Amino acid sequence: MADMMNVRLSLQAAAAQWGEGAQLSFNGDETRIHLGAIAQENDALRTIQRAARRLESSGIKRVKLVGDDWNLERRYAFAQGFYAAKGARELDFGPQSESDARELDALIKATRWVREVTNGCPEAIYPMSLAESALLLIRGLGGDQVTARITAGE
């Protein structure tokens, strides 16, 4: 696991050597995402997603989220930014509760489905296939709690 980049959130501003307002700093196998004095959580989530995108675009393919400042929304924001349509990425979300892990997995599955539908070719995504695909996703996420019926025709 030595080749994984550890990613930690920091509430401190980055050192001056990284530039004014820098959102990322590096030290060995650890990257810090500097949230600084961000007061609004929505701004923090945007910063986290943007930083993840920068890491991914710089060629980093394997990361592990470390530290106590990661919650469900922050992990999901990072996952949104650490995405590429081509090539494998490995993202270890670090320790989290079982319920958070299930919810995060469901969010990521739903996001992946939306991307596949959005980027799919029109021949493969016609109304019935879209309905069936959506139903499979929802049943996969909801399990026995979901019942549905597709009505086709005029």
Residues covered by each model-derived region:
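Short amphipathic alpha-helical segment within the helicase RecA-like ATPase core
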Residues: 1-154
